[in-house]
């Protein structure tokens, strides 16, 4: 049953760190946790509606949130910071206002961008790339092969596994297909595993995409 556990939660405190860093009173904890989720969803929705179809779209790997007494700091790790700050920073201002509208807080909001050079070595970005290809009706085997090639070319990737489940290529019966290259040691705690589950909305229904990327051991 070891393979059933979430690869990131399994390694929290070992090779993974929390994406939300703050302290709160017990009575406020659930409200702030919900606020963090709203911030992340707002950023993803903004990117999906404004930037996702761009030819040089690089994706979002993770969103880190830190809270201080009078400040909420949001750090977006992305492969396309230039797209968010285009128009002399207007894109970032629009995003900031959109986030403020989605939450009710008296704290100041600060959004920073961290560029990822090898973004296809990030599970979230690679899973979103696969979803875009499947939604464009590209054959799933061709998509998996191309995604593995893109990831392995990044240099720091030691192994990768991709799994797609659903009505593949419009088949009547849903099934699961997967491909792997290199080592993906899910049982090794010191192994740096990046993982993402992402849904692809196709004309034949929803396809579930899972990506595991092994980046070495600590």
Swiss-Prot record:
Record keyword Glycosyltransferase present: no
Keywords, ordered alphabetically: Chloroplast, Plastid, Ribonucleoprotein, Ribosomal protein, RNA-binding, rRNA-binding
Which superkingdom is the protein from? Eukaryota
Q: What Pfam families would the database entry show?
A: Ribosomal_S3_C
- One cellular component (GO) term of this entry: chloroplast
Q: Which GO terms describe its biological process?
A: translation
Q: Which InterPro entries match?
A: KH_dom-like_a/b, KH_dom_type_2, KH_sf_prok-type, Ribosomal_S3_C_sf, Ribosomal_uS3_bac-typ, Ribosomal_uS3_C, Ribosomal_uS3_CS
Query: Is-annotated flag, keyword Transmembrane helix?
Result: no
**Residues in domain KH type-2?**
47-117
Localization (cell): Plastid, Chloroplast
In alphabetical order, the GO MF annotations are: rRNA binding; structural constituent of ribosome
**Subunit text:** Part of the 30S ribosomal subunit.
User: Which family, according to the similarity comment?
Assistant: Belongs to the universal ribosomal protein uS3 family.
Q: What is this protein called?
A: Small ribosomal subunit protein uS3c
Protein's organism: Spirogyra maxima
Q: What is the lineage of its organism?
A: Eukaryota, Viridiplantae, Streptophyta, Zygnematophyceae, Zygnematophycidae
What's the encoding gene here?
Answer: rps3
